[in-house]
């Protein structure tokens, strides 16, 4: 991979040789690994053996052909434009803001009137995730759009610094039995908000649509 010398991310890059006060494990890139904060892992070179200064971008497969995205907002395009050859591409770079619901999952047994904690993680390639919101809707289609009136603030865990995963949680008491759809939305320090529409490109890159989890709430005994 190659990075422009004017790219500010170079000031944050690390050549790592240890992890948790131990030599870097083989699976994590021993003996040294390049860390490019906020960027997709294709830049995090394992087994780093050399760094070269070039007078132009590297033209190897992984820069010129692989891991490329449309040069459009959010890397979005259409199959028709790809087929017609109308898509200009650029190397993939930063990860978009994204969040996940970790628990409950679809197999969790929930009980009406019994409080539970919804938990998840959030991160962004543009800094820290500094806002989380949760939406809980009964009999709500998992493919329908969400409105701003549906969002409730969630509690964020400790901030370990830019680009790190950040936990979040929200306590919810299901009011009655039924099917509910949970949705989570993150916002990062640059003001980027997780969208509720998908993105399409041939590689499937940059997908960060709001995640949903359907749960079933039963009656209390």
Residue ranges and their predicted role:
Residues 1-221:
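Extended, aromatic/histidine-rich regions of cofactor-dependent oxidoreductases associated
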């Amino acid at each position: 991979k190659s990075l422009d010398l004017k790219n500010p991310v170079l000031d944050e890059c690390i050549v790592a040789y240890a992890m948790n006060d131990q030599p870097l494990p083989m699976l994590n890139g021993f003996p040294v690994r390049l860390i490019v904060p906020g960027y997709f892992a294709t830049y995090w070179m394992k087994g780093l053996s050399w760094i070269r200064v070039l007078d132009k971008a590297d033209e190897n497969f992984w820069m010129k052909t692989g891991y490329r995205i449309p040069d459009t907002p959010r890397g979005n395009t259409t199959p028709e434009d790809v087929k017609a050859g109308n898509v200009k591409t650029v190397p993939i770079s930063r990860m978009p803001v994204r969040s996940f619901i970790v628990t409950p999952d679809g197999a969790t047994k929930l009980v009406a009137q019994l409080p539970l904690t919804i938990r998840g993680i959030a991160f962004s390639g543009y800094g820290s995730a500094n806002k989380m919101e949760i939406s809980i809707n009964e009999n709500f289609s998992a493919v329908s759009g969400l409105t701003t009136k549906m969002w409730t603030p969630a509690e964020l865990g400790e901030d370990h610094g830019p680009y790190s995963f950040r936990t979040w949680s929200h306590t919810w008491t299901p009011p009655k039995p039924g099917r509910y759809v949970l949705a989570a939305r993150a916002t990062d320090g640059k003001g980027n908000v997780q969208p509720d529409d998908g993105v399409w490109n041939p590689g499937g890159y940059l997908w960060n649509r709001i995640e949903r989890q359907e749960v079933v709430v039963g009656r209390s005994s």
